[in-house]
Amino acid sequence: MNRRLEPLAWIVGLTLGISACSGGEDATGAKKTVKRDTIAQSEFQPSELEKTVNSLVTKIGDTAPVDLQVAVVLKQLNTYFAPMQIGANRAISELSLSGQVSAPTSSSGTEAVDEQNAIMNDELSSGYNALAVSPFETGNQPPIDAAADSNIPVITIDSDLAGSKRDLYIGTMNSEAGKTAGTTLVSLITANSGTVILLGHDDAGWPDGFDRTMGAKGVLESAGFNVVVRKTDRSETGEAADLDALATAITDADPPVVGMMGMFSNAYRCAIAAETAGKTGDDIAIAAFDFEPKTVEFMRSGLIKATHAQRQYYMGYLTPYVLYGFKALGKEATKSILKPQMVDDFRFNTGLDIIPAAKLDSYYSYLDSLGIGSSN
């Protein structure tokens, strides 16, 4: 989610103090005390996720305090990852734990992978006994497997390494995200048939993009629409190529285009192409993903009817609670509590927020209440 955020320091490691209650099991028989911060109620608050968190907190409250030092290693500490940092730090504080949220200074390539591995290795060797990581690629697997082999619970967040020994993945399930977005677009289209263009990815070589696109495609086809996928061009000249291809597809489509959706953060390209082809929001229903400034502009103008946002805050917020649950309750007992959002034994789906254009300001107020943003 690329939007204007409250100023955040680029901190490679923000450490929160450890309270007396987290220094191992209490010989007096005292139970673990957890006090969640009060967040203003909102229609956008994911009630089912909140129920799961509250269930986990209740069960944790029946146990004696345990010693846990949480290392959370992200890819970056800005923009998209900032809500994860804020969520993780809030949960660490509520649990009265020692914890650190870190990230490499490099954002891609071998250097970033090596730096992320070095952070994990350093933190594990210094005594952290719970690990969460948003891995770049398979090159991040050795520290994850080493931690698991040492009986340290490991969670992957936002991006997964299914072939590793991690205990759980917390994040968006792209196939389900695509289905949700497809359902949103169906609800926005007034026609019962016609062509729908997806600016997405139709090559299984990138599983996340492919799964999201195919999830939406399946829902739309089942609803009776003819679906055309334009594989988005991510090169330096990609925007011009996408705009030309989309405008041509709109002009040439038979049956006519009644809906469009961008599956990634460049979704605004659909709106630009529709304008180029002389179409309005009354002609074509357009839905999007994420909050690029141009996407927001088109939502305010009425050309984009809705967007979808991943729940990075909850990815970060849930992670320390789940790691603590693994330690205090056991992994299977914790996963049983998480069952409403588990898609299988090792993946937890945080879901999507659906934001109609008419409720954009209300959504920004909700983000402000979480401490992760201010309105555009």
Set out the residue ranges of the language-model regions:
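Extracytoplasmic "Venus flytrap"
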Residues: I39-T63, D67-G87, A91, L95, ...
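Hinge/cleft segment of the Venus flytrap/periplasmic-binding protein
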Residues: G29-V66, L220-A223, L318-N376
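C-terminal motif of bacterial Sec signal peptides marking the signal peptidase cleavage site
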Residues: G17-A20
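An alpha-beta-alpha
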Residues: V70, L74, A88, T180-T232, ...
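Flexible loop/hinge segments that line or gate small-molecule binding clefts
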Residues: T138-E176, E292-R300, I304-K305
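Bacterial signal peptide processing site
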Residues: S22-E25
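Hydrophobic alpha-helical
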Residues: N121, A130-D149, A216, R234-F298
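Hydrophobic alpha-helical segments within soluble ligand-binding/sensing domains
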Residues: E48, T52-V57, Q116, I170-V196, ...
